[in-house]
């Protein structure tokens, strides 16, 4: 029979999993998410998380505790009498007492091929590191940082054209299907768990804005992966002086291109920029305070002459 589930998640990445579980007949008895944050044009309105919005649309009770470490929070969690909890980018550490509360445990959807890229930013780090593949895994949670036993996995190739946004969306959809399959196996009593490998562990540290500046002295492929790994947020950037004005541009998409010159130098009329070995051609960018735009549209209004230099 269908499982009684607690769902715990916050951002857009978690929404497909919530919708798929609800659509497959499981009884989602409560949704835990982060509290609404100030937003809107003046920051005066409280904006709910994407998960809260979807849960309320589905008529599921929503809880937004500041902590799960109090006796009151634990008692409330236990009172749901859930078979299992599904956790997708919740953003809060679950203490052992919470992990032990559901009859069959807590199951996390993680956007990497564990034990590679444990931590906060696995999608960004996989692209930035030049990884050939990524994926999603369902693991039974323990108190460690993404150290639980793995139940299921799905792999996905990373192409040079993929941005963090592209990979995020693909893994979100694949992960939703994977979690549905995992919960079906759990319901049947046939979910097999495998310990993570002890070697190959890497950590996906949170992305800092200080990392975003582009280093044109690196090889072109590394520059491309850096740009795509930070697109759209926080956005890899560089500055160039045009008509005496220093202009900061976020580079959102690019492609490998032919060209040589001093790193950072514009080598043609199509925004091809020299790197250490060859070049990249910018295809999408964003000027400060403006909307993202195709490079071709930018060049219609702004001349970036060969010989100018990004830095």
Swiss-Prot record:
Can you tell me which residues the record assigns to a coiled coil?
none
Primary enzyme class: transferase
EC assignment: 2.1.2.9
Q: Name one GO cellular component term.
A: cytosol
Q: Which of UniProt's keywords are assigned here? A: Protein biosynthesis, Transferase
Molecular function per GO: methionyl-tRNA formyltransferase activity
Catalyzed reaction equations: L-methionyl-tRNA(fMet) + (6R)-10-formyltetrahydrofolate = N-formyl-L-methionyl-tRNA(fMet) + (6S)-5,6,7,8-tetrahydrofolate + H(+)
Q: List the disulfide bonds.
A: none
Question: Which protein family is named in the record?
Answer: Belongs to the Fmt family.
Per the entry, what this protein does is: Attaches a formyl group to the free amino group of methionyl-tRNA(fMet). The formyl group appears to play a dual role in the initiator identity of N-formylmethionyl-tRNA by promoting its recognition by IF2 and preventing the misappropriation of this tRNA by the elongation apparatus.
What's the protein called, per UniProt? Methionyl-tRNA formyltransferase
- Species of origin: Bradyrhizobium sp. (strain ORS 278)
